[in-house]
């Protein structure tokens, strides 16, 4: 009797092991089915970089418009946004959740160099296309990543062009830079130095700051004592606010010049208490009140579909960064696959909507080096200083 009980227990145990072995972790969906295509984006909806969070919400407007118009080849876009608080560790967590639980087909946007670098290799390893990172680190595209397609002009290119404008148009020779101590700021620093070298000039001050710093008194004093006539800012919105307010308190009034990352004038004007007036920035797209037919279309759609959102640079940047994936999906047709989308993306040439012209090939995934230059006028108005301008020193185009 005891032998039979032991045999029964053994049989049950073996059966249980076999059952567990057959219940392998479910593979994530392929990213699409007959009715939908799943696309994701991370972005800071909270935290020090929250003003940049509207980028991800702007992409949602684009996909809402696409779905309203019938979708793409019979499929609608199902879009997922996750808040990573501009924290690379959080980015890793939310991206893995989207890939492994939701089954994302592709990512668009994604604010920040450090957050993007934290997931770049993971996305490539999982063969997931990533279009239009909302960052411009040269390490995103050099060496080439077959799954990553950049829309944003490199920080190095932008800083190069802005420095040229300072020297040649503003006729200023004493230039300083306050930069975030990560890839975002360091790439810009390289671009500034590269351009200054052509004039046999050097920076009078180069000051790194950490993304989480809240006191810039010593840094501002160093800038003031350097005699800088113009200061480039490659920092996050919170740091920019603190810098300008601290500078105003000590009577330091250089010509501030900043990245397109701080080109949402109504926002920056408001949070600086009006101190943003007169600041010059790069711009990756047209002014928000542009009469460009597509800008008018999306601006009207925003009023109708997302009245709670403020139409501005960061918000429409989400459209600009995500639009190429829509174009590629249209080209592919009904027979959707990752390989087909990659082929379509690699064939995009001189494609332009509300931003610069984009061209990608199998050997080059940096889409552009062009930007506009604008100035914040009274009451946060936009003053166009320079149309599309490319970096004549860009080395990536020569490869």
Regions from the language model: what does each represent?
Residues 1-38, 395-399:
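Short, low-complexity disordered leader/linker segments with a strong preference
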Residues 29-35, 40-60, 82-89, 111-112, ...:
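Extracytoplasmic "Venus flytrap"
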Residues 244-319, 389-396:
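Extracellular/periplasmic periplasmic-binding protein-like sensory domains
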Residues 26-41, 71-77, 167-173, 335:
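Immediate post-signal peptide segment of exported/extracytoplasmic ligand-binding proteins
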Residues 330-343:
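Short, charged, surface-exposed loops that flank catalytic or proteolytic processing sites
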Residues 26, 35-37, 293, 346-399:
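Solvent-exposed, acidic/polar segments of extracytosolic/periplasmic ligand-binding ectodomains
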Residues 89, 103-206, 255-281, 287:
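Extracytoplasmic ligand/sensor domains, especially the bilobed periplasmic-binding protein
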Residues 27-28, 36, 51-57, 69-142, ...:
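Beta-alpha junction/loop-to-helix N-cap segments that form part of ligand/metal-binding clefts
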């Amino acid at each position: 009797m005891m032998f039979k009980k032991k045999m029964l227990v053994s049989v049950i145990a073996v059966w249980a092991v076999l059952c567990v072995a057959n219940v392998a972790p479910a593979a994530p969906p392929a990213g699409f089915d007959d009715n939908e295509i799943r696309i994701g984006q991370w972005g800071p909806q909270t935290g020090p970089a929250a003003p940049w969070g509207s980028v991800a919400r702007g992409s949602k407007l684009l996909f809402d418009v696409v779905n309203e118009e019938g979708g793409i080849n019979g499929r609608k876009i199902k879009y997922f946004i996750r808040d990573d608080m501009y924290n690379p560790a959080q980015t890793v967590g939310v991206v893995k959740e989207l890939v492994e639980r939701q089954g994302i087909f592709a990512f668009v946007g994604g604010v920040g160099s450090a957050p993007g670098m934290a997931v770049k290799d993971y996305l490539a390893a999982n063969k997931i296309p990533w279009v239009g990172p909302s960052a411009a680190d040269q390490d995103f595209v050099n060496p080439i990543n077959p799954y990553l397609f950049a829309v944003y002009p490199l920080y190095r290119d932008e800083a190069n062009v802005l420095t040229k404008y300072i020297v040649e148009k503003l006729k200023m020779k004493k230039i300083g830079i306050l930069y975030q101590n990560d890839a975002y700021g360091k790439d810009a620093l390289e671009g500034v130095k590269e351009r200054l070298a052509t004039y046999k000039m050097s920076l009078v001050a180069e000051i790194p700051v950490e993304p989480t710093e809240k006191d810039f008194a010593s840094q501002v004093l160093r800038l003031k004592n350097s005699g800088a006539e113009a200061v480039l800012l490659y920092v996050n919105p919170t740091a920019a606010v603190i810098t300008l307010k601290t500078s105003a308190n000590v009577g330091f009034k250089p010509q501030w010049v900043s990245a397109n990352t701080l080109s949402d004038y109504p926002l920056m004007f408001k949070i600086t208490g009006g101190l943003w007036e007169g600041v010059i920035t790069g711009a990756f797209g047209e002014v928000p009140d542009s009469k460009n037919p597509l800008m008018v279309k999306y601006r009207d759609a925003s009023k109708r579909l997302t009245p709670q959102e403020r139409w501005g640079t960061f918000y429409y940047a989400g459209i600009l960064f995500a639009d190429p994936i829509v174009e590629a999906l249209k080209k592919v047709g009904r027979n959707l696959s990752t390989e087909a989308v990659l082929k379509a993306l690699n064939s995009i040439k001189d494609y332009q909507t509300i931003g610069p012209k984009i061209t990608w090939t199998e050997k080059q995934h940096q889409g552009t080096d062009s930007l506009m230059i604008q100035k914040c006028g009274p009451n946060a108005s936009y003053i166009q200083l320079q149309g599309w301008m490319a970096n004549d020193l860009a080395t990536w185009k020569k490869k």
